[in-house]
Amino acid sequence: MAPRNPELPPTPLRHPQPQRPTIPRLFSRLSHASKRSFRSYSSSFEADDERSGSDSRSQFDSDSDSDMDTSTERGQSRERRCRRSYGGEQYADEDTRPTSEKELAGWYMYSFAAETYVICAISSFIPILLESLARENGVLLKDRTSPCKASYDKTPDGGNDDNQCVVHVLGMEINTASFAMYTFSVSVLLQALLVVSISCAADHGNYRKKLLLAFAWIGSFSVMAYIFVSKEIYLLGAILAIISNTSFGASFVLLNSFLPLLVRHHPRIEYAEPATGDDLDFESEDQMRNSASHLLADEHDDHYALSRVHTKEELTSIELQLSTEISAKGIGIGYCAGLFVQCIAIAIVFKLKNSTWSQRVVLLFVGAWWAIFTIPAAMWLRPRPGPPLPAASESSRGGVAAFVSYTLYAWKALFRTVSLARRLIDIVLFLGAWFLLSDAIATTSSTAILFAKTQLRMEPWALAMINVISTTAGIAGAFSWAFISRRLGLRPHQTILACIVLFELIPLYGLMGYLPFVKNWGVLGLQKPWEMFPLAAVYGFVLGGLSGYCRSLFGELIPPGSEAAFYALYAITDKGSSIFGPAIVGAIIDATEEIRPAFWFLAVMVGLPAPLIYFIDVDRGKVEGEKLAAVIEGYRRHQDESFDDGRFPSDDDDDGRGPILGGRDDEDEHDTEREVRGR
C-alpha cells in the first residue's frame, strides 16, 4: 500500500563539548592538495570510468609525492589527524579518489531501478497475486467442496461470508487471504537474518559492490520468474516472494553502506579541512606566511585562491548537509520511478482485463525494470573496498572460511551493540516503541490491501491506485511535517505522537464497521471501496512524518561517535519486528474467517508505542549517551595509538578486548553502568 520508509540520513543534534576557540586559518589549495596522495586502485570489478583517469592520477601522485618530500613532520602528522576526522582509516587497497558525478549517478540509478519493487511489487501486486493463486486452488469455506470464485466477483447480495476460501498448504488449512501474510513473515525473518550476516561484508573488504549486484540480479530475475507461475505451481509464487523480498532488503543495506563513502570522498568534503588546536599551536605562523605568499600570485589563477579552514563543527555540518542532499535526491528519484511504473502497471491491468495473467505481466515488467537499470549502477558505481577485519588472518583465506569469519564478526558486533544499548534507558524506550510502530506500519499496509481485495471486492487497477495515492501523500508528508512542527512549536517526540494519533484513526475507522447504526447506513467503517482512497492518503501522509522524525529522535540519543553501530541496530529492529505482525494477522484471519477483526490487533499495535515515546527524555538520553561515549573513546584512543605504530588493531589488543563500536570488556561495562546510574 505504501513504499518503503524513506531512509533519510540521521541528523542528530547534540550540544558540542566545550572546546578552545579555534582561529580561522587561510591556506593555499595547491599546498593542501599536495599533501593528499590518491592511491591507485584497480579491480576487475571497478567502474568503467576508473581506469580512464589512471594516467592523470599517476602523474598527480608523482607530483604529490615530490611535494610530500619537502613537507615537515608536523604536516604529515596533521594530515593523519585530518584523515581521522573524516572517519577514514589507512589500509591496503583503500580507494581515496574523490567522488565523481558518474559515481553518484550510479548510486542514484540503483534507487531508480529497485524502488519500483517496493512500490509496485511487494506493496501491491505480489500480495494480490498470491491471494489470487491461493484462491484458484482453494474451496469455499461454507462447504469445503465448491471451488472459489475470484475475490473481486460481486455477489448478488453484496455479502462477504459466502466468498471466504481456504486452501491446504503443507497439510494445513489456511485462509487464502492469510497465505500472503504468512509468506511475508517468512521473507522478513530471512531478510533480517541475512541483513545482519552481510553487514560486516558491507563495511569490510572488497565485497560491497559484488554482493549488491548479486542480490540485485537474484531479486530482479525472481520477480521476472512470476511469468511462469500458474495455478498448478502456486507455491512457487510464495517462494519467489521470499527470495525477491530478501534480496531487495539485502541489496538496499549494501547500497546505503556506500552513502558515507560518497560523502566522505566528495570534493566538497575533501577540500574542507578541519582546524585543530595542535595545528594552531605549531603551524599558524608558517601557514599564514605560506598563505600570504600566494596573495602575490597571478590574480587570474583561481587555483591559488585562499580558502578558510573549517572547524570540526563546520565540517560535520557540511557532511550532514551533503549526506541529506544525496539521500533525499536518491529517494526522490526512486519514488518518481515507482510512480511511473505503477501508472504503466495500471494500464497493463486495464488492457488485459484484470486477470492473474495481467498481474504476472506487471511483475515481469517490474523485474525487467529492476534488472535493466541496475546495469548503469554496475558500470558507474565504484567498489570502494573497506578496511580488513581486525581478525585479518582469518578473512584473508577466502572462500567459505572468509564467509564464516565475516558472518561471525557481524553477529558479535550486533550483540556488543545490544549490550551497550541496554544501559541507556531512553534508547531502550525508543527501540521498544520503534519495534511496535514499524511492525504496525508494515502490517497495516498488507492487511489493508487484502481487505480491499477480499472484502470490498476491489479490482487490481483500483488496488494499484491505492498505492499511487499513498506514495504521493507520503512525498507530501515528508515535506509538510517539518512546517507543521515549526508552526505548532512541536518537539520531535511530540511530532511523532501527533503522527501516531493520526495513524490510530485508520484501524479505528475499520472497527466502526461493527457499530450497528453504521452498518445500517451501509457506508463508513470501510463498507464501500471508495473509502480506501482517503485512508490511503492519511497512511501515506503519516508515514512521511514518522520515517524522518523517528530517525531524528533516535539520532539525538546515540552516544557520540557510535552512530553507525546504533543505526544498524535501528535497521535490524525495523526489519525484525515485521515478522510478527503479518503472522498474527494471518492467525486471526484463520481463527475468525474474516479480515476485519485484525483491525483490533492493529489498533493496539499502533497505540502501544505512544506511552513509550512520551516517557523518552531527550536531555537525559544525551547525558547518558555522552558518558558512555567517554568510555568508548578510551578504547578508540588505544586503536589510534596502534595505528600510529603501523599496525592494525585486532581482537587481541588491549588484554583481549575486541572492537565494539570501539571495544570494551566486562569491567568497562560495569564502570559505565555505575557512571550512568550515578549521574
UniProtKB/Swiss-Prot annotation:
Q: Which InterPro entries match?
A: Atg22 (IPR044738), Atg22-like (IPR024671), ATG22/LtaA_families (IPR050495), MFS_trans_sf (IPR036259)
Protein's membrane topology: Multi-pass membrane protein
Q: Quote the biased-composition stretches of kind Basic and acidic residues, using this chain's numbering.
A: 50-60, 638-650
Q: List the disulfide bonds.
A: none
Pfam families in alphabetical order: ATG22
| A GO biological process held by the record | autophagy
Q: Which residues are glycosylated?
A: 354
Predominant place of localization: membrane
Q: Tell whether Transferase is among the UniProt keywords.
A: no
Instruction: Enumerate the UniProt keywords alphabetically.
Output: Amino-acid transport, Autophagy, Glycoprotein, Membrane, Transmembrane, Transmembrane helix, Transport, Vacuole
Q: TM segments?
A: 110-130, 178-198, 211-229, 233-255, 330-350, 361-381, 398-420, 424-444, 464-484, 496-516, 530-550, 569-589, 598-618
Q: What is this protein called?
A: Autophagy-related protein 22
Q: Could you tell me which species this protein originates from? A: Pyricularia oryzae (strain 70-15 / ATCC MYA-4617 / FGSC 8958)
